[in-house]
């Protein structure tokens, strides 16, 4: 029997937790990564070189690689504030940017680095061009730019993307559409709902591919609410927003953590974008999705509350075996 095909969609921080564990399973992995980041080092390089931002892709490359820890530290090394124009840039971002310039696109750079790091899965930016994320708030106000959205004091109604450097309609990478249509399972998240997951899904070709695919669509719900994005959200609210943007109820299965996060891990100065634990609305989830898997997926580490990648992947593998029957 062929290995199941699984496509994981999101941002570099959230889905890396899942990919680190998933890479050890007998599964054909494709990671689809957002290109809407406009903050920090990624934003600076994107603006200076008009390329797709490298930061999220860098994190996914490392998550899917089994390179020695020292090489990983080298790739993640961030230059000091005293280092002039290099200040704040991770070395890996500069490497991706350099190869992108040599090879004509970030897409090409990632394919080269995937081979260089002997990664067996596939990694694709959701679009081959940098995209700008726009958020329309319920009061009618609109904010452009991922890094600016959370700063506006309002509730987001919906988001959309535009090409950053031309007026053409945003287009998905062709390989991304193929992966979605050929997958047995699509995994969304975990990660920032409006600024990491949805920037991929609102690209027209990706939205349409998700409508057409026969794959099981799984959403890994966030454990904590996020400042400026999902304040006071329940888990069912997260799913409702996804279905709203996809234009129909496409989420088949939701994975939800039900382990309690200790109070000491909330409103942490170290992770100040996260607020409180997401409320569990089981009845709402059952209305929004076909299947709900509630379990203890929590991992407490370095003062933060995260998903336990091994436990999540165990459930994903059990589920994909069922849907392939």
Swiss-Prot record:
GO biological process, one term: regulation of cell shape
Chief location bin: cytoplasm
Keyword Transferase (UniProt): no
Protein's recorded name: Putative gluconeogenesis factor
Intracellular or extracellular location(s): Cytoplasm
Family label: Belongs to the gluconeogenesis factor family.
Role description: Required for morphogenesis under gluconeogenic growth conditions.
Provenance organism: Streptococcus pyogenes serotype M1
Domain of life: Bacteria
